[in-house]
């Protein structure tokens, strides 16, 4: 039936099913948007635990609504028994319902999510689901009188005058109507104004000089971000202004970020999703893409918390790449994992990870436990140090594109997840992550200067994870990767734990000569016990690496460091981890602003570690 097309919409059930599907999506997006909009009140109230909880729970909304919709279709329409012709009509009616919809691309993805739970894999083609988008997202506008525009444009009253620009910047901040006082907004605007001068220098202002700012704030963890761009002539420069609470519980603008590189760091795939109140998400993506043209649309949808849309868009990009490439999938280079089989396509900058059916004795785990660890990372604050992953089910690959060694590897380690259907290999479950250079390989090939800064970055990554209440579990170099821009990121999650669930202990003193000389562990070890003093022999065999590590991160071998961070988090403290180099922060007079926070932030992130290893963010 491929390629056939219904010419008559004659099944009344098809319209009712389409309407039920759209009702399910509209309910989902209403709840999604409500949670995102409430982020402003949580930020104003400094409700950091509430903000983190909302970020976690919002991720779960989508699957709940999909399950509800699938159950309704089965109960009311016996959806799984309907004919192919009826399902084609359902899609056509659904397209008609989306003509004036403000989130048509999200609604199409929701349609796919529900119908693929009901229909057999043979239906997974464009006749029945949205393999390709059907409704344009260009130039969608909300025509309602009281609606907010996607962005506001500001024209400084006296171009070339510092006073005119200053008043404009004050008005930009004031228009967000934050219900908490700034410590000194005038002072902060002066800092921003100076940052603008430093960025743009003595440029001639064109007739079209303007500042465009997205109408909603971007909330994540303890920060709110004003995101916009400066247009002057043919030049457009993106910027972001982070607004934080200081130690006096007043607001301050912490810094000004400019240009694609700094915004890429803010919107990194290794960070938690933003909470943003959006009526027309495609318009936000289009605006953000103008600030970061190197960032694909699917990553921007992810960053906005619309990870299912990002996942759908990514898969379309992958199929397009597959069609226009000819290289073969292979076993990924590097040390093979004990719980994951990893493969890649050399021409495609991602890796595919499949959970094995069995594990060596030292890995006391299960498939369900491993999947729960990946879900933990998905819903947790990744603080720029844990790679986001895309989870897929029932993915069909062309058999002829697989190297024979890879097929045999999958047959051996993952037989329960493999279906061989003619020319296709179907994997029932897998994760896809961005490809990085394993840190152990990077260190082997690095120059002395690169090695030094990679080791510093490695320690910074662990400290950032600790600040987010994460203990990596297995801290070996091979479980960390270096991105193409030099950032060190953790990507092996099967042993990850909450820091507050671990018991950090000092190695006991031996009581006898036999215990002192024993090559075995003679003291008792509980299931969540961790002995930081024992990290050294596994990590620091290279004398040069050891010297750098001990100079910058010796405290990681001290149980007191870990226990101190654990106690503070258990006491309710939410650490600050900044998505920009701390040396970029505005420096305020002594006694004002963040107080001791400045010292802690700088000690966690030596500026040279990131600027020397790679000046670009992830």
Swiss-Prot record:
One Pfam short name: AceK_kinase
Annotated GO CC locations: cytoplasm
Superkingdom field: Bacteria
Annotated residues for binding of ATP: 332-338, 353
GO annotation (BP), single: glucose metabolic process
Entry EC no(s): 2.7.11.5, 3.1.3.-
Active site: 388
Catalytic activities: L-seryl-[isocitrate dehydrogenase] + ATP = O-phospho-L-seryl-[isocitrate dehydrogenase] + ADP + H(+)
Keywords from the named record: ATP-binding, Cytoplasm, Glyoxylate bypass, Hydrolase, Kinase, Nucleotide-binding, Protein phosphatase, Serine/threonine-protein kinase, Transferase, Tricarboxylic acid cycle
Keyword check for Ligase: no
Keyword Lyase found: no
Localization: Cytoplasm
Main location: cytoplasm
Entry's Gene Ontology molecular function annotations: [isocitrate dehydrogenase (NADP+)] kinase activity; AMP binding; ATP binding; phosphoprotein phosphatase activity; protein serine/threonine kinase activity
Protein purpose: Bifunctional enzyme which can phosphorylate or dephosphorylate isocitrate dehydrogenase (IDH) on a specific serine residue. This is a regulatory mechanism which enables bacteria to bypass the Krebs cycle via the glyoxylate shunt in response to the source of carbon. When bacteria are grown on glucose, IDH is fully active and unphosphorylated, but when grown on acetate or ethanol, the activity of IDH declines drastically concomitant with its phosphorylation.
Similarity comment text for this entry: Belongs to the AceK family.
This protein's name: Isocitrate dehydrogenase kinase/phosphatase
């Amino acid at each position: 039936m491929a390629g056939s097309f219904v010419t008559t919409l004659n099944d009344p059930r098809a319209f009712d099913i389409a309407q039920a599907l759209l009702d399910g999506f509209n309910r989902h997006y209403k709840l999604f948007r409500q949670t995102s909009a409430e982020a402003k009140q949580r930020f104003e109230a400094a409700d950091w635990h509430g903000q983190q909880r909302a970020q976690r729970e919002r991720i779960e909304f989508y699957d709940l609504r999909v399950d509800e919709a699938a159950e309704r279709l089965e109960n009311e329409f016996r959806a799984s028994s309907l004919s192919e012709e009826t399902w084609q009509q359902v899609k056509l009616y659904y397209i008609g319902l989306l003509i004036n919809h403000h989130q048509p691309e999200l609604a199409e993805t929701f349609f796919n999510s529900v119908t693929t739970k009901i229909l057999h894999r043979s239906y997974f083609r464009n006749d029945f689901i949205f393999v390709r988008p059907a409704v344009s997202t260009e130039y969608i506008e909300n025509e309602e009188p009281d609606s907010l525009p996607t962005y506001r444009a500001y024209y400084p009253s006296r171009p070339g005058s510092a006073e005119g620009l200053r008043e404009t910047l004050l008005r930009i901040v004031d228009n967000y109507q934050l219900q908490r006082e700034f410590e000194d907004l005038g002072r902060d605007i002066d800092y921003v104004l100076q940052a603008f001068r430093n960025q743009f220098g003595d440029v001639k202002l064109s007739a079209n000089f303007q500042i465009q700012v997205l109408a909603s704030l971007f909330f994540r963890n303890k920060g709110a971000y004003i995101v916009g761009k400066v247009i002057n002539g043919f030049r457009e420069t993106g910027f972001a202004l982070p607004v934080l609470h200081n130690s006096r519980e007043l607001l301050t603008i912490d810094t000004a970020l400019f240009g694609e590189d700094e915004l890429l760091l803010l919107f990194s795939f290794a960070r938690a999703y933003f909470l943003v109140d959006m009526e027309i998400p495609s318009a936000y993506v289009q605006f953000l893409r103008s600030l970061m043209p190197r960032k694909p649309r699917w990553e921007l949808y992810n960053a906005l918390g619309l990870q299912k849309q990002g996942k759908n868009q990514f898969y379309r990009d992958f199929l397009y790449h597959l069609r226009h490439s000819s290289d073969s999938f292979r076993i990924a280079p590097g040390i093979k994992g004990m719980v994951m089989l990893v493969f890649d396509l050399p021409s495609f900058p991602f890796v595919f990870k499949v959970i094995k059916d069995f594990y060596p004795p030292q890995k006391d785990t299960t498939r369900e436990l491993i999947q729960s660890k990946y879900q933990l990372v998905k819903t947790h604050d990744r603080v720029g140090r844990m790679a986001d992953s895309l989870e897929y089910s029932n993915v069909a690959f062309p058999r002829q594109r697989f190297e024979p060694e890879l097929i045999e590897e999958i047959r051996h380690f993952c037989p329960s997840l493999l279906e061989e259907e003619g020319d296709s290999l179907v994997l029932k479950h897998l994760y896809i992550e961005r490809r990085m250079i394993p840190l152990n390989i990077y260190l082997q090939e690095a120059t002395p200067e690169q090695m030094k800064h990679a080791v510093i970055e490695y320690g910074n990554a662990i400290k950032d994870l600790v600040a987010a209440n994460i203990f990596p579990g297995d801290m070996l170099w091979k479980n960390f990767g270096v991105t193409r821009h030099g950032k060190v990121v953790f990507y092996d999650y099967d042993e990850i734990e909450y820091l507050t669930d671990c018991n950090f202990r000092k190695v006991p003193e031996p009581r006898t000569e036999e215990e002192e000389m024993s090559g075995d562990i003679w003291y008792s070890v509980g299931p969540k016990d961790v002995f930081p003093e024992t990290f050294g022999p596994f990590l620091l065999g290279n004398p040069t690496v050891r010297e750098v590590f001990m100079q910058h991160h010796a405290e990681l071998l001290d149980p007191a460091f870990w226990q101190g961070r654990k106690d503070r988090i258990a006491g309710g403290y939410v650490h600050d981890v900044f998505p920009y180099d701390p040396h970029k922060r505005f420096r305020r007079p002594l006694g004002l602003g963040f107080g001791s926070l400045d010292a802690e932030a700088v000690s966690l992130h030596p500026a040279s570690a990131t600027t020397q290893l790679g000046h670009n963010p992830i």
